[in-house]
Amino acid sequence: MPSELFDLVPHDKRWFPWAEIEECFWPGRGRRSHTINPSLASIKNAAGIYCIAWAPITTIPAPDEENLQYVGQTKNFKARMAQFASSAGIFWEDRYAGHSAAWRWPQGETAQMQIAFFPIQPELDHMLTGRLFWYEALAINAYFQKHDNTLPPLNVIKNPDPVAFV
């Protein structure tokens, strides 16, 4: 049986503010991601677990972070961040379909948004899918155990209203 501990290493062992992700993942006409942030650009099309938090946060990312708001998994970090931004009203003044949890994010808010990426090594698609779900469950469980059997706020799907951060 695989480990029941979340043992993925956060990319660059740090949180990335939204502004840094946006500049690298969508650099604009004539610019290239790898010239803006080579390290972050190296994982933009990778699969893995991502954690979204609201600063202040600890230095080293972990899924049991006090101000963690969401844990998710994806086969492409850039595509998933685009979906989140579209639904959270970050790219435009309105919200659009793309990421269901982002509808619970305060519309357009990015000032204290921090994201950690935990890449997973590429493998056969059916194995990658299983590993993504397994690690997402481990990450959510790490938060659940440390925070009195509660889920990260945006992972609570029955809450129809945007979360208010204090």
Region annotations inferred by a language model:
Residues 1-69, 73-166:
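Boundary/linker segments flanking structured domains
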